[in-house]
Swiss-Prot record:
Keywords (A to Z) from UniProt: Disulfide bond, Metal-binding, Metalloenzyme inhibitor, Metalloprotease inhibitor, Protease inhibitor, Zinc
Positions bound to Zn(2+): 53
GO MF, any single term: peptidase inhibitor activity
Name listed for the protein in its UniProt record: Metallocarboxypeptidase inhibitor
Species of origin: Nerita peloronta
Length: 53
């Protein structure tokens, strides 16, 4: 099983609460049909941030 490497989001849009945040598409192992799950992870200055109130 090959879990995809983290990569920049292809079409992240913007982070309303933190406009300068960086989006990373990150995947981890999971118990589903694919063997992994992926999510958009927003960070700013090394800290994970939320984009929606």
């Amino acid at each position: 099983l090959q879990i995809p490497d983290d990569r920049p989001c292809t079409n992240p849009g913007r982070c309303p609460l933190v406009p300068d945040a960086t989006c990373t598409y990150t995947c981890k192992a999971a118990d589903n049909d694919y063997g992994y799950e992926c999510q958009h992870l927003w960070t700013f200055e090394g800290q994970r941030v939320g984009c929606h109130a």
